[in-house]
């Protein structure tokens, strides 16, 4: 050994690879725990064990990681900020099960996943489980298969030939059948191949659906049966593309008085190209305004279907405010009024009644707008889906129904348009709500004993009506003294008790229409800062300035209602907060967590806290 050798080793030590801290995080992710040994680090990098140890020591000298000796020959290394590791996003793909498990996903990741997968489960430690279903691929809002696969690779961080082969097959499956208009004006069902027509379509469809074969791959369609054809083939696993020439109706003169946002203009252009579709976006994203843009683009007489008279009145007001239409151009058709004009707004219930049906069928509508489109799958509203010869536009933030048949919306109305919520949050068009599940202790032991001794509906009502929630509502309102607040309830007795306790008006289905309108208007103008609202407030009532939504009873609601209630706070400016109260240790806990999955799947972070017992404020003389 020469005298120069030690110096050479010093030079080698100076050339130790300078790795970024992210390399340690990546290695920790790979080993699956928040610490690692130098040997493990070397296996996850291109370094030798000595180089790995030297690199770790350099990071330790810089204060980025810590060292803990666990034996005479071995040490473990971990980041100084251990929380950064435990809260770090991890995406794990299980291609055979078509599942994606994500720990601590950020908003963008959740928004991307929602475009091709369905959130199945969440847990309190920040884990999300997504499932890729056939329906998710069929309805993916992408222009091409390449666009869809690019989104998947971006969020998954890897390519899975097995999964991508399945996705490709489902994407192609959704393009095996299409409806088109023959040059002679009648409707044709076209299959991609003779085998598909002969072995799938014709055995499942009878003479009521198909009039006669045109060729081995084409059949003449009974036009009144187009909705049933779509439904039947969808159930067989073959969604049908609708490329028919749709009716435009008698022309109307209508101009917008405002400029559409870029994404709204994109929605309108995609809709006019397709002839049908569903605008899916968070409340506050301007779906109604975009629908007016679609009305102007189609330029034909328009029928607008809504779930309530209140929403019909709102539509009329917004049309007069934002377009060149006048009151004389707009009719309302429901229990209060029955006028059919160039633009007519009707309730789903009235439009579906036999004695009123001919009035709507005989009018040559160019466009049918289905507001709150999640109503369409309900049996009471199913008739509205039979208006298949028109341009069809659905509007919703939440296509979810508890029966999980939301896919029918996209089959009978059209494919989704504009489903990326995360982009709208990031660009500031919509305020991302802060959603909190707050677990509340019982108000007194008597209520808890009553819950334990009952079952069924009585048990659910006992948990929902826990009087401990009244004190928590007072506390939440005191936390947000300047916020305009909506308190949602499920049971009338509970609503009246809360209304009296916080001195705020209570609006329910029993409230006369005129008084409801008066209270809503006072809330909009800021003359009232708090309202207690039953389910009547869940369907599109325009309360644009609500900053706080308090849900006092979760067991009576659905995932759709949960998203709508959060939507009362999701507006383009200001703070947005939603607090769901659930009685600790009851079935209400798990129900509320399931209820919030839809919001979580759209990129909204849902947190959970334990409420302390709150002493009611002392009464003043």
UniProtKB/Swiss-Prot annotation:
ATP binds at residues 281-288. It is an enzyme of class 5 (isomerase). This is Putative DNA 3'-5' helicase Rad25. The gene is rad25. Residues 469-621 form the Helicase C-terminal domain. Residues 268-417 form the Helicase ATP-binding domain. It catalyses: Couples ATP hydrolysis with the unwinding of duplex DNA by translocating in the 3'-5' direction; ATP + H2O = ADP + phosphate + H(+). Its EC number is 5.6.2.4.
């Amino acid at each position: 050994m020469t005298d120069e050798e030690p110096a050479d080793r010093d030079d080698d030590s100076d050339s130790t690879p300078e790795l970024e801290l992210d390399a340690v995080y990546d290695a920790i992710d790979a080993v699956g725990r928040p610490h690692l040994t130098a040997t493990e680090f070397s296996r996850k990098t291109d370094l030798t064990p000595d180089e790995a140890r030297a690199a770790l020591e350099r990071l330790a000298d810089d204060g980025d990681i810590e060292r803990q000796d666990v034996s005479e020959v071995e040490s473990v290394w971990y980041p100084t900020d251990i929380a950064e590791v435990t809260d770090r996003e991890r995406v794990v793909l299980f291609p055979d099960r078509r599942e994606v498990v994500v720990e601590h996903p950020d908003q963008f990741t959740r928004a991307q996943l929602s475009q091709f997968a369905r959130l199945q489960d969440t847990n309190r430690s920040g884990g999300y489980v997504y499932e890729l279903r056939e329906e998710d691929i069929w309805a993916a809002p992408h222009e091409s298969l390449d666009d869809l696969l690019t989104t998947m690779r971006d969020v998954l961080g890897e390519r899975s030939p097995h999964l991508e082969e399945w996705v490709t097959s489902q994407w192609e499956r959704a393009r095996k059948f299409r409806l088109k208009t023959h040059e002679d004006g009648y409707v044709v069902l076209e299959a991609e191949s003779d085998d598909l027509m002969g072995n799938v379509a014709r055995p499942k469809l009878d003479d009521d659906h198909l009039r006669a074969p045109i060729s081995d791959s084409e059949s003449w369609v009974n036009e009144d049966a187009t909705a049933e054809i779509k439904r039947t083939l969808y159930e067989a696993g073959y969604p049908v593309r609708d490329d028919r020439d749709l009716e435009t109706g008698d022309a109307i003169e209508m101009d917008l008085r405002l400029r559409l946002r870029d994404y709204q203009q994109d929605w309108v252009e995609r809709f006019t190209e397709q002839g049908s579709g569903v605008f899916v976006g968070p409340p506050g994203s301007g779906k109604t305004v975009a629908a007016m843009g679609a009305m102007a683009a189609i330029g034909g007489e328009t029928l607008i279907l809504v779930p309530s008279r209140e929403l019909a009145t709102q539509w009329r007001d917004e049309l007069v405010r934002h377009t060149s239409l006048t009151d004389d151009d707009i009719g309302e058709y429901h229990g209060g009024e029955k006028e059919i004009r160039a633009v007519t707004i009707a309730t789903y219930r009235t439009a579906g009644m036999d004695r009123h049906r001919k009035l709507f069928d005989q009018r040559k509508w160019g466009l049918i707008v289905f507001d709150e489109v999640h109503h369409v799958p309900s049996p009471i509203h199913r008739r509205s889906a039979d208006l298949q010869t028109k341009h069809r536009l659905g509007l919703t933030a939440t296509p979810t129904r508890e029966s999980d048949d939301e896919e029918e919306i996209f089959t009978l109305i059209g494919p989704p348009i504009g489903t990326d919520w995360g982009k709208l949050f990031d660009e500031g068009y919509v305020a991302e709500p802060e959603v909190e599940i707050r677990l509340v202790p019982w108000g007194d032991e008597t209520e808890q004993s009553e819950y334990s001794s009952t079952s069924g509906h009585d048990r659910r009502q006992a948990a929902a009506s826990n009087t401990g929630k009244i004190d928590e509502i007072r506390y939440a309102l005191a936390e947000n003294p300047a916020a305009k607040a909506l308190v949602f309830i499920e049971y009338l007795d509970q609503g009246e008790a809360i209304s009296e306790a916080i001195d705020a008006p209570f609006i329910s289905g029993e409230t006369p229409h005129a008084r409801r309108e008066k209270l809503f208007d006072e809330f909009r103008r800021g003359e009232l800062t708090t309202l207690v609202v039953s389910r009547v407030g869940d369907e599109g009532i325009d309360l644009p300035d609500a900053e706080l939504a308090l849900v006092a009873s979760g067991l009576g609601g659905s995932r759709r209602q949960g998203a709508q209630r959060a939507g009362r706070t999701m507006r383009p400016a200001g703070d947005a907060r939603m607090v769901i109260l659930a009685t600790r240790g009851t079935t209400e806990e798990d129900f509320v967590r399931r209820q919030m999955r839809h919001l979580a799947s759209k990129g909204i972070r849902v947190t959970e806290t334990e409420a302390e017992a709150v002493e009611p404020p002392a009464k003043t003389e």
